[in-house]
Amino acid sequence: MGRGRVEMKRIENKINRQVTFSKRRAGLLKKAHEISILCDAEVSLIVFSHKGKLFEYSSESCMEKVLERYERYSYAEKQLKAPDSHVNAQTNWSMEYSRLKAKIELWERNQRHYLGEDLESISIKELQNLEQQLDTSLKHIRSRKVCK
């Protein structure tokens, strides 16, 4: 006996909606991990809950590298498709604004992580990278203190 198809509409019951979100998010993250392993693909996934909580997965050690690569790729694609120079210039400024805004948001997120905030939304791999970065910074600070 198989499951029936679920009608694609918003789930009205708040508790059922949250349970469904959690289960489907976990399934989506698992699928992203599986495709990265099985197909040796570079996979990144970003999910925001209805409350704005961030959930992410990256097969690379650093989501920032993947996002920068995506920005470069999409920028190059748009350059090839924009024939009008005026429109092209406007698009360049718009894209640059979007790119810088995303970079600022990323830096703010990283700063919160360095301060120990919003750590529940990041993966174990990212926590290990954060720990390594903080250890490196502490070593650098201690070595500078010894020199003075």
Swiss-Prot record:
Description of how the protein assembles with itself and partners: Homodimer capable of binding to CArG-box sequences.
CDD domains: MADS_MEF2_like
Cited function: Probable transcription factor that promotes early floral meristem identity in synergy with APETALA1, FRUITFULL and LEAFY. Is required subsequently for the transition of an inflorescence meristem into a floral meristem. Seems to be partially redundant to the function of APETALA1.
Pfam families per the UniProt record, alphabetical: K-box, SRF-TF
Matches recorded under Gene3D superfamilies: Transcription factor, MADS-box
Organism: Brassica oleracea var. botrytis (Cauliflower)
Domain of life according to the entry: Eukaryota
GO cellular component: nucleus
Protein name: Truncated transcription factor CAULIFLOWER D
A GO molecular-function descriptor: DNA-binding transcription factor activity
GO biological process: cell differentiation; flower development; positive regulation of transcription by RNA polymerase II
Keyword Lyase set for record: no
Keyword entries, A-Z: Activator, Coiled coil, Developmental protein, Differentiation, DNA-binding, Flowering, Nucleus, Transcription, Transcription regulation
UniProt xrefs under InterPro entries: MADS-box/MEF2_TF, MEF2-like_N, TF_Kbox, TF_MADSbox, TF_MADSbox_sf
All residue ranges annotated as the K-box domain in the record: 90-148
Domain MADS-box: 1-61
